[in-house]
């Protein structure tokens, strides 16, 4: 995707991978005792704390501001980061993440951990696997795609039409991933 290539089957195959992984490692499929043994086997306490704190509490790069944006931008960012309501919502999400083990998640499911061509998809780096809510992996990749769509405003394209088409493709991936996930699950 770093080369602005369109992968026609990415949403379908990514959703199929997640839906199958989530369904077959949940109590929707497994007997309760087997499911609990699976969760115990994949407790992964060391890497789980990285996700619990890194994603929900310690915002990566939050103290790094581009001086070219000016002090007003830095103050604006800090007002969001330290907003008590937002902080409370982050703690609520973290609690849900920590206490609602519904399935084994990939834990780091984003486009850099997916190898794809026009017809095949392979997923790597499952070292963060542990029990968590169904929605985590899908939310993680959707956030990654939104970030990529935003970054396209500063990346070089041969034409503005090409840029707009690629951003539209990325936005369509979000809806397709969700729709296919629900369909396959």
For each feature predicted by the language model, list its residue ranges.
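Short amphipathic C-terminal alpha-helix that caps PH/PH-like domains
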Residues: 14-22, 142
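Flexible loop/turn segments at secondary-structure boundaries
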Residues: 37-42, 111-114, 150
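ATP-dependent phospho-/nucleotidyl transfer catalytic cores
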Residues: 2-13, 17, 27-106
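Structural signal for well-ordered, non-membrane alpha-helices
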Residues: 19-22, 47, 178, 182
């Amino acid at each position: 995707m770093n080369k602005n290539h369109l992968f026609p089957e990415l949403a379908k195959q990514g959703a199929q991978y997640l839906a199958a992984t989530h369904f077959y490692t949940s109590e929707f499929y497994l007997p309760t005792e087997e499911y609990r043994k699976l969760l115990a086997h994949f407790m992964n306490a060391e890497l789980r704390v990285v996700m619990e704190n890194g994603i929900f509490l310690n915002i990566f790069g939050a103290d790094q501001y581009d001086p070219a944006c000016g002090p007003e931008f830095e103050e604006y960012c800090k007002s969001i980061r330290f907003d008590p309501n937002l902080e409370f919502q982050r703690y609520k999400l973290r609690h849900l993440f920590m206490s609602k083990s519904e399935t084994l998640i990939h834990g780091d499911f984003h486009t850099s951990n997916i190898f794809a061509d026009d017809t095949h998809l392979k997923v790597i780096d499952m070292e963060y696997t542990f029990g968590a809510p169904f929605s985590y992996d899908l939310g993680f990749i959707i956030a990654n795609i939104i970030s990529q769509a935003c970054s396209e405003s500063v990346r070089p394209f041969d034409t503005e039409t090409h840029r707009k088409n690629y951003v539209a493709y990325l936005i369509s991936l979000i809806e397709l991933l969700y729709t296919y996930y629900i369909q396959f699950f």
